[in-house]
């Protein structure tokens, strides 16, 4: 997260927690016409998977956080507040969140290139807490990336495991009407050649 996003997350986290939810992270996207402030919320781990985030949760957080932002005023100028569940391609904001998703695949965008690349996709292998880094399996190699160099990270959903992968038909389906073999144009419908 950016410094501004981290500042806002630290400010709003107690408010979200007071509603019985967890603030996963914040995206602050400044723009000339007005910034976007996006909050990702989830239910605490102890309540998963029995409970999931719903629209009512997002509305409650939006109301409470809006009131707090009006008082604290950490953002100058106009902005749009968005409150969202993380979704299946959830963003990862902290080392703890990377640790929770060990064994899953993630897409990572770096602040500064590493090995000539800024974009990686690989399996999250482990967290090196001492080095404050995440180790990924990328193209058959272990790649250690410093947490401070990660700009954005998202889980890559395993659509097959979720039962949402598109199915390919194993054999050709039935022929559609109107696709029968056509008769040569010089034969009549009765099968006799036409006199011209």
UniProtKB/Swiss-Prot annotation:
The coding gene here is rimP
Q: Which GO terms describe its cellular component?
A: cytosol
Give UniProt keywords alphabetically: Cytoplasm, Ribosome biogenesis
The entry's family comment says: Belongs to the RimP family.
Q: What is its main location?
A: cytoplasm
| Classification via InterPro entries | Ribosome_maturation_RimP (IPR003728), RimP_C (IPR028998), RimP_C_sf (IPR036847), RimP_N (IPR028989), RimP_N_sf (IPR035956)
Q: Where is this region: Disordered?
A: 164-196
Annotated compartments:
Cytoplasm
One Pfam family hit: DUF150_C
Its biological function?
A: Required for maturation of 30S ribosomal subunits.
GO BP of this protein? ribosomal small subunit assembly; translation
Is Protein biosynthesis among the key words of this record?
no
Q: Which NCBIfam families match?
A: PRK00092.1-1, PRK00092.2-3
Which regions are flagged for Basic residues bias? 173-182
**Lineage top rank: taxon:** Bacteria
State the organism of origin.
Xanthomonas euvesicatoria pv. vesicatoria (strain 85-10) (Xanthomonas campestris pv. vesicatoria)
Descriptive protein name? Ribosome maturation factor RimP
Spell out the PANTHER family in the cross-references.
Answer: RIBOSOME MATURATION FACTOR RIMP
